[in-house]
């Protein structure tokens, strides 16, 4: 069902894939639509123990409507750029993950996921707690349960 990376020399290890997912600040979520895929850049949090990607959303909008119709998604994260051998063209890591994305309906689980998500982006736990106290009512949290992932590093030239 999922195709392997064609150029084997570009494949990164499972540990490197996890590092990209842990450290990348943004990713692109692609959702099935009728004629074209719908892709949107998002902030996210990766939990390697649960093999899941979490992101927040409003409770209404195109993304929500499409996920309610079809929960199969593709997610792409771009890792760091590495300059090697005095080359002008960087090497770039990327990860592609496929899975099913669902709204987290349990409020305790939503708040736990929201806190872990926010800790990735905010400088202190105090700020996170304050923001959650003020803004968590209108926030929805989604979980992508990863079914397949792959990663590679390529030189962009």
Where are these regions (language model features)?
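Charged, gly/pro-rich active-site loop segments
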Residues: 2-8, 83-157
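A generic structural signal for nonpolar/aromatic side chains embedded in well-ordered alpha-helices
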Residues: 21, 66-67, 117
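Active-site-adjacent structural patch at catalytic or cofactor/ligand-binding sites
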Residues: 57-59, 69-82, 91-102
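Short Pro/Gly-enriched beta-strand edge/turn motifs at strand-loop
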Residues: 11-12, 23-28, 124-127
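Anion-coordinating catalytic cores for phosphoryl-, nucleotidyl-, and glycosidic chemistry
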Residues: 9, 18, 62-64, 75
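Extreme N-terminal tail/first-helix region
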Residues: 1-22
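Beta-strand secondary-structure signal
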Residues: 28, 54, 74, 98, ...
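Short beta-strand segments
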Residues: 24-59, 75-76
